[in-house]
Amino acid sequence: MTMCSGARLALLVYGILMHSSVYGSPAASGLRFPGIRPENEAYDEDGNPQQDFYDSEPPGVGSPASALRDAYALYYPAEERDVAHGILDKAYRKVLDQLSARRYLQTLMAKGLGGTPGGGADDDSEPLSKRHSDGIFTDSYSRYRKQMAVKKYLAAVLGKRYKQRVKNKGRRIPYL
């Protein structure tokens, strides 16, 4: 038993010595002593350590995200980035406003028809689905009408350049 614990103690001491010799040096731990200088470090005339160009990463090496961020900062100045962020924020707020207005309208419609906005358990879902399909049809039809109005307006403004002409074999080619 004492022999085993003696061997363990010797192994422990050996491990501590090896660990301290590898990781315990002042240069490895990053500690700097004024009188001790590592042999592999270069100094200028004033005694200041020079930057090691071989151990540091080159500017192009890094994660793809940081490279993309650096390229973005290089090609787009801060003023343009601020303008772009402002435009994005404005569009995002507009979309959020539309979504909240749509939700508010849905709650008003549900309250006006006597239902709950979530479509509670006592309410049957058939009128809700019918209203939903009617809304989809109305939305699609109104979008179609708007497109036709835009085409009519463009035809009136641009004249013959916008009108489609029939080519050989009946294919239609827009004239823009």
Curated annotation (Swiss-Prot):
It is found in: Secreted. The modification Leucine amide is found at residue 158. Residues 1-24 form the signal peptide. Residues 150-158 are annotated as: Important for receptor binding. Its main location: secreted. Keywords: Amidation, Cleavage on pair of basic residues, Hormone, Neurogenesis, Secreted, Signal. The modification Lysine amide is found at residue 169. One of its GO terms (cellular component) is neuron projection. The keyword Cytoplasm does not apply. Residues 36-62, 115-134 are annotated as: Disordered. GO terms for molecular function: neuropeptide hormone activity; peptide hormone receptor binding; pituitary adenylate cyclase activating polypeptide activity; type 1 vasoactive intestinal polypeptide receptor binding; type 2 vasoactive intestinal polypeptide receptor binding. Pfam families: Hormone_2 (PF00123). Residues 25-80, 173-176 form a propeptide. Transmembrane segments: none annotated. GO terms for biological process: adenylate cyclase-activating G protein-coupled receptor signaling pathway; adenylate cyclase-modulating G protein-coupled receptor signaling pathway; insulin secretion; neuron projection development; neuropeptide signaling pathway; positive regulation of cytosolic calcium ion concentration; positive regulation of ERK1 and ERK2 cascade; positive regulation of gene expression. PACAP is a neuropeptide involved in diverse array of physiological processes through activating the PACAP subfamily of class B1 G protein-coupled receptors: VIP receptor 1 (VIPR1), VIP receptor 2 (VIPR2), and PACAP type I receptor (ADCYAP1R1). Exerts neuroprotective and general cytoprotective effects due to anti-apoptotic, anti-inflammatory, and antioxidant actions. Promotes neuron projection development through the RAPGEF2/Rap1/B-Raf/ERK pathway. In chromaffin cells, induces long-lasting increase of intracellular calcium concentrations and neuroendocrine secretion. Belongs to the glucagon family. This is Pituitary adenylate cyclase-activating polypeptide. It comes from Ovis aries. The lineage of its organism: Eukaryota, Metazoa, Chordata, Craniata, Vertebrata. The gene is ADCYAP1.
